[in-house]
């Protein structure tokens, strides 16, 4: 069995795609396959990659199915023990696969790992790092890797996570697919974080390796939500409410049940 399957989802990617693929080929760990999924690109990026990398496995979709469905299609072709889901605007450190595989091999309770995320801006690999909160709040950390926890965490970056194959299969068995395709694009990784935690899988940030990420490259690298297209904004807001519907509502329901139990089981004071 191949050790790692790298699934890349492309839709009209720009020049950063070339650097992304070069970083893959420069990995110190070599036991991997690349599954290149194209979501109906019209800018010639698919043809360029096919010419430069004939050994990749290519999956060509006629339409842009969005991130969730596109990745699900790519995952269905993966044969590796571990599966890396890689955005096209990510540059991996040369030891990325090696360190992540080592972490997964050493701990069978890990369902997902990823390295430390750094910003990639204007063609430069920067050294500041940031983490994303579950509510969409980003905390910028300008002091190297300070604040990055070496251990279990609720979630890691959704731009370059590596999942255990058995984790993927267990999610598919429970829900019917790995990513919930209702999300299309945005918050599908947060959905998985809740789901993996519920199923008892651990997630870990591997601090001995890193990856650089442009962020939102498919929507013109616009960082602020309101700088992106109206359709993207609407989808993000919809997906936030969908997350709340799926998970957070249960917390409020349980809390209200708890309060009602306290109210009706407490002794009633007599006048």
Regions found by a protein language model. Give the residues of each.
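N-proximal low-complexity "stem/linker" segments adjacent to membrane-targeting elements
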Residues: 1-25
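Glycine-rich, basic loop-to-helix element that forms the pyrophosphate-binding segment
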Residues: 61-78
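Short aromatic/hydrophobic "clamp" motif used to bind/position activated sugar donors
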Residues: 83
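Conserved small/polar residues in nucleotide/adenosyl-binding loops
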Residues: 264-271
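A conserved acidic beta->alpha catalytic loop
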Residues: 23, 38-47, 63
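Active-site donor/metal-binding and catalytic loop motifs
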Residues: 174, 181, 199-202, 206-227
């Amino acid at each position: 069995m191949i050790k790692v399957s790298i699934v890349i989802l492309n839709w009209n990617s720009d020049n950063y795609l070339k650097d992304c693929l070069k970083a893959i080929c420069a990995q110190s760990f070599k036991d991997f396959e690349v599954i290149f999924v194209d979501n109906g690109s019209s800018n010639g990026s698919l043809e360029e990659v096919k010419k430069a990398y004939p050994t990749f496995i290519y999956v060509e979709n006629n339409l842009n199915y969005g991130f969730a469905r596109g990745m699900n299609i790519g995952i269905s072709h993966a044969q590796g023990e571990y599966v890396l889901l890689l955005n096209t605007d990510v540059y991996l450190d040369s030891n990325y696969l090696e360190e992540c595989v080592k972490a997964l091999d050493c701990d069978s309770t890990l369902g997902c790992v990823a390295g430390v995320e750094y910003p990639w801006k204007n063609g430069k690999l920067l050294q500041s790092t940031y983490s994303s909160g579950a509510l969409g709040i980003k905390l910028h950390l300008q002091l190297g890797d300070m604040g990055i926890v070496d251990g279990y965490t609720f979630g890691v970056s959704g731009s370059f996570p590596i999942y255990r194959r058995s984790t993927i299969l267990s999610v598919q068995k429970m829900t019917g697919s790995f990513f919930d395709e209702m999300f299309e694009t945005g918050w599908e990784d947060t959905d998985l974080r809740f789901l993996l935690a519920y199923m008892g899988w651990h997630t870990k940030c591997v601090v001995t390796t890193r990856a650089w990420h442009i962020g939102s490259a498919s929507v013109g690298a616009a960082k602020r939500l309101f700088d992106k297209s109206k359709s993207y904004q609407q989808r993000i807001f919809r997906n936030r409410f969908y997350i709340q519907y799926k998970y957070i509502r249960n917390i409020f329901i349980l809390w209200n049940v708890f309060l009602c139990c306290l109210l009706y089981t407490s002794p009633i004071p007599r006048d």
